[in-house]
């Protein structure tokens, strides 16, 4: 199953979606294993939406299909507590319009997710890089509170059976 249909069918609001693109200007400078992340907001007026932060547009909301344009691989993670995830998804809307960056009053994609979940009561560890605390994909994927529910490179049989109910 492709990631867009998986998310539309199974992912709860607040799921975090990691993607890698076939071509990215920042991928060589980015120490994250997964190069981009967004928060699945859910549906609004029948449209599935993702909140992300990009270097060109800052924090914005985009249709799920647009989020996946040009993607190479995808992973989706969730927490056990769906209510916490909903709070994080709602928080993401309050950050719309913040410019992209690493300084004060700036937001890059992994910080967006970390801040939304911090507001929901879930602290995320960071890495100290060049004197700054930076959030990377590994800060989420290596944290056992996060459950991987989809991996486009490795859809295992137990996941297929689990998803069938």
From Swiss-Prot:
Additional observations: Displays sequence similarity with a group of bacterial permuted NlpC/P60 proteins. Thus, the ancestor of the OPG091 gene might have been acquired from a bacterial source at the onset of poxvirus evolution.
Record protein name field: Protein OPG091
GO cellular component annotations of the record: host cell cytoplasm; virion component
Family: Belongs to the orthopoxvirus OPG091 family.
Gene it is expressed from: OPG091
InterPro entries linked: Papain-like_cys_pep_sf, Peptidase_C92
Primary location group: virion
Keywords attached to this entry: Host cytoplasm, Late protein, Virion
Membrane-spanning intervals of the chain: none
Subcellular location: Virion; Host cytoplasm
Function: Contributes to vaccinia virus virulence in mice but not to replication in cell culture.
């Amino acid at each position: 199953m492709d990631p867009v249909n998986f998310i539309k069918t199974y992912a709860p609001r607040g799921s975090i979606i990691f993607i890698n693109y076939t071509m990215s200007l920042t991928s060589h400078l980015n120490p994250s294993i997964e190069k981009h992340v967004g928060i699945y907001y859910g549906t609004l007026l029948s449209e599935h939406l993702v909140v992300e932060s990009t270097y060109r547009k800052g924090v914005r909301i985009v249709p799920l299909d647009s989020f996946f344009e040009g993607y190479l691989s995808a992973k989706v993670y969730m927490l056990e507590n769906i209510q916490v995830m909903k709070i994080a998804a709602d928080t993401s809307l309050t950050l719309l319009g913040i410019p992209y960056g690493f300084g004060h009053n700036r937001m890059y994609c992994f910080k967006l997710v970390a801040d939304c979940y911090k507001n929901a009561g879930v602290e995320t560890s960071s890495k100290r890089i060049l004197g700054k605390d930076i959030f990377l994909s590994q800060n989420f994927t290596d944290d056992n509170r996060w459950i991987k529910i989809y991996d486009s490179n490795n859809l295992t049989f137990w996941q297929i059976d689990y998803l069938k109910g």
